[in-house]
Amino acid sequence: MRIHAILFSLLCARALGAQTFLQMSDPQFGMYTKNQGFAHETVNFEFAIATANRLKPAFVVVTGDLINEPGNLSQAAEYQRIAAKLSPAIRLFSVPGNHDVENEPTPQSLASYRERFGPDYYSFRVGDIAGFVLNSNLEKAPQHVAEEAAKMETWLKGELAKAREARVKHLIVFQHIPFFLKEPDEEDQYFNIPRETRLRYLKLLHQYGVHQVFAGHYHRNAGGRDGDLEMITTGPVGMPLEEGRSGMRIAIVSDSGVRHKYYDFGELPESLAEIK
């Protein structure tokens, strides 16, 4: 009986891990010291990656501001050095933030990001999850890269249609800047996407059955709903603002939906089984 119980536990853990992911945001190497170093960020991100290796999720997504100073090679190298410590069994998806591609992206800043980190928007599939990584600064400030912004939006429509045709159960969007912090019709500000673009994207996401958007940028936790779409804004792995604390979000995906909770570094569970 004991052997059966152990096998059952292992099978449950495997199933859980296949539908579990960690969201980390804003490691932002260099923020604590205004680009004079990144020792604090190194400690935090090392701990975050070690935690991921212990918890063994299916994947980790880092929702932007990988570095603090656009184009800073030493900051980028440190992010990649630590990220490379993630177990090969756990997939890693990096998302561009405004500090990675500049507040107003240019063809040059996009090219620099792509050369260093890879595509700035793309899709992926893990089990019953179809993930869509977006470059939110193409939504926020496309004035210098209008063609790229239009290209991403057209691409997203096509990818969402493919996922729906394939009957993927969970379609989830990951980007850096949240569409909104609390209300879908809130006023434009630094921490959200301009209303005209926001509402257009939200309409598209509703059309294809997207129920979750995970973002960062705010360096604190926030969230709201637009009907059955949940906007989840996650606090930082790196430096928090105001009442925020460094940590990460754990998401559990099942037939009944997506459950998630933000954990400060001091309150992380020992295993995923604790939060089933």
Predicted regions mapped to residue ranges:
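A short C-terminal boundary segment appended to hydrolase-like catalytic domains
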Residues: 252-276
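N-terminal active-site segment of His-dependent metallophosphoesterases
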Residues: 17-77, 275-276
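Hydrophobic h-region of N-terminal signal peptides that target proteins for export
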Residues: 8-17
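Positively charged n-region of N-terminal signal peptides that target proteins for export
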Residues: 1-5
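Histidine-centered catalytic micro-motifs
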Residues: 172-179, 211-221
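Extended active-site neighborhood of metal-dependent phosphoesterases/phosphodiesterases
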Residues: 35, 72-169, 191, 196-207, ...
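Short acidic, glycine-rich surface-loop motifs adjacent to enzyme active sites
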Residues: 163-183
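Active-site glycine-centered loops adjacent to acidic/histidine catalytic or metal-binding residues
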Residues: 26, 64-65, 97-98, 176, ...
